[in-house]
Amino acid sequence: MTEQTKAYFNTPVHERDPLVAQALDNERKRQQDQIELIASENIVSRAVLDALGHEMTNKTLEGYPGNRFHGGGQFVDVVEQAAIDRAKELFGCAYANVQPHSGTQANLAVFFLLLKPGDKVLSLDLAAGGHLSHGMKGNLSGRWFESHNYNVDPETEVIDYDEMERIAEEVRPTLLITGGSAYPRELDFERMGKIAKKVGAWFLVDMAHIAGLVAGGAHPSPFPHADIVTCTTTKTLRGPRGGLILTNNEAWFKKLQSAVFPGVQGSLHSNVLAAKAVCLGEALRPDFKVYAAQVKANARVLAETLIARGVRIVSGGTDTHIVLVDLSSKGLNGKQAEDLLARANITANKNPIPNDSPRPAEWVGMRLGVSAATTRGMKEDEFRTLGTVIADLIEAEAAGNADGVVEGAKAKVATLTAAFPVYAH
C-alpha cells in the first residue's frame, strides 16, 4: 500500500479538510449551546450516528432483500429486513417499504402508484398546516395533478371535517391526503377515512411529524382507516433523514415496491437503512412510550405558559409536539420573532398561520416544537422556564426594548443547555 493510499483511508477530516472540519465543530457546539425548538428537528442517538457513519455507506445496491441488482449485499439485506420487520411491528401494518430517501420521495412514490397525470388530489391548505408535497404549486406534485384544498374552521382553527366532506363530494378526488408540517391538533383518521370511502377516494396519511407520537401511543394510529401511510424517520421518530411507506393492502404491495424502485428512486442509501433499523428498534423499547408522552406534556406546558402571558396560540393549544404562535397582536412577524429568539440561543422558525399572507416575509406565525429539547431530557419545569423566556422576549420586542432582555434570556438558556448536554465528549 502506498503512503497516499494509507493517507486516504486513515486521515481524519480535521486534517484532510480544515474548512469543513471547522464547520462541523461549530455545528456540534451550536447544538450544545442552543435549544432547538424547530418542530421538524430532533437529536439522533449515538447508535444512529454510528450506523450513519459506517462503512456500509460504500455499498451500492438496487432492488430489495433477496432480489438485488448487485452482488455483495447480504449484510445490507440483514439491516433492510430488520427495518422492514420493525416498521411493521411498530406501526401495526402488514407491509413496509423502508427505502424512500425522504418523506417527499415517499409521497411521490404513492402518487406514482395511485395517480395518473390530471387526477384530483384533496389536501390540507398549506397555510393551515399542510405540506408542499401534497399537491402544492411549486412542487412536482402540484404540476402534474389537479390540486384542491380543505381548510380549518376560521373560529376554532381545527380542521373543518364538514367542509372537507362537502369539498370532497364536490371535487370527487382520486386521493384524499391528511397530515402536514404545522397542524398542532389530533387528526380524526376515522372520520377522514369514511369521507374518502364515501367519495371513492384513496386515503393517504402523511404522518411525518407525528410518527413518533403514533409509535409511542401518544396519538391515534392511522390504521385501519388509511389505505396507505407515509412518514419520515426524523422528527418525532428520532431517526436519520429518510422516509417510510406503510400499508395493509396486499394487492398494492408489489406495485408499491416498483413505485419506489425504479419508479422514483435508483440505488438505496445502505448506511441510512442501517440507521433506520436502529431508530425503529429504539422506538420499540418501552422507554420510547415514556418519551412520546413527555413530548405531549412538554408541548402542552409550553402552550399554556405562553397563553398565560397573553401570547396567542393557534387553535388555543396543542395535542402534538407543535405549538403554533400568532404574533399579529404583538405587531411582530415570524421572521422578527425567529431572529429575536436566535439572539437568546433558541432556534425556531417563521411559519404561516391559517389565512396568513402568501408572502413568507409577511407571515405572522412562528412554529415551535418540543421534540429535540425533550430528547435532551427537559421536562415540564424546563418548558415553563422556556415559555417564560420566550414571552419575555416577545413582550420586550413589541415594546421596543428587547436589548435589555436578551442577555438575561441568554443566561437562562445557557443554564438549561449546561444541565442537559448533547453527545458529551
From Swiss-Prot:
Cofactor: pyridoxal 5'-phosphate
Residues with N6-(pyridoxal phosphate)lysine modification: K235
Key word Nucleotide-binding present: no
Subunit structure: Homodimer.
Protein EC: 2.1.2.7
Residues annotated as binding (6S)-5,6,7,8-tetrahydrofolate: L126, G130, H131, L132
GO MF, any single term: D-alanine 2-hydroxymethyltransferase activity
Organism: Aminobacter sp
Pfam families in UniProt: SHMT
A Gene Ontology term for the protein's cellular component: cytosol
Protein name: 2-methylserine hydroxymethyltransferase
Function, as annotated: Catalyzes the reversible interconversion of alpha-methyl-L-serine to D-alanine with tetrahydrofolate (THF) serving as the one-carbon carrier. Cannot use alpha-methyl-D-serine, L-serine, D-serine or L-alanine.
Localization per record: Cytoplasm
Family: Belongs to the SHMT family.
UniProt KW Transferase keyword: yes
Keywords per UniProt: Cytoplasm, One-carbon metabolism, Pyridoxal phosphate, Transferase
Reaction catalysis annotation: (6R)-5,10-methylene-5,6,7,8-tetrahydrofolate + D-alanine + H2O = 2-methylserine + (6S)-5,6,7,8-tetrahydrofolate
Enzyme class: transferase
Marked site (Plays an important role in substrate specificity) residue numbers: T234
GO biological process: glycine biosynthetic process from serine; tetrahydrofolate interconversion
The protein's annotated pathway: One-carbon metabolism; tetrahydrofolate interconversion
Disulfide cross-links: none
Gene: mshmt
